[in-house]
């Protein structure tokens, strides 16, 4: 499974990392990144893929932004950069230890990177949704994505992930997913990244 990185609805989980109020004015393309993450969350709900939400020190950084649409998800609070806290690990265990992780949120060079490294060290397959991940600095964001790719992470886009998950226009949920793709994902400034690919 770790060979080519083909996503499946079975054995996958969506990790939503730290999309909180205090980050709103400082994160590059925050609104568009959250919009893409919200689409991923909606799709995973439709496809019955479990979701885990974290908040970094919410007392200081505030709650998850409402436009993510994460009502009903109880956030796992943390101070570590990695999402892989004891409570998150316990949740993953209760979900049957999914082996494919769809990862989005902020910041790319900090919590996203540390989470991805922890997951990779556990032998899990990590799919980072590049247009649903950002940082305060575009430089940090792009270098983090490049570095994570070197470590074996699969990079994709929101639309790419959703289409991989359904795989066929005959999928029973395809029309619902198609509605989420009616408008192209907003630009999050990733074109510069492709000069290094």
Swiss-Prot record:
Q: Which Gene3D superfamilies match?
A: Isochorismatase-like
Signal peptide segment: none
The family database entries (CDD domains) matched by this protein are listed as:
YcaC_related
Give any Gene Ontology cellular component: cytoplasm
Q: Which InterPro entries match?
A: Isochorismatase-like_dom (IPR000868), Isochorismatase-like_sf (IPR036380), Isochorismatase_domain (IPR050993)
Membership in a protein family? Belongs to the isochorismatase family.
Check the record and name the PANTHER family matching this protein: HYDROLASE (PTHR14119), ISOCHORISMATASE DOMAIN-CONTAINING PROTEIN 2 (PTHR14119:SF3)
Official protein name in the record: Isochorismatase domain-containing protein 2
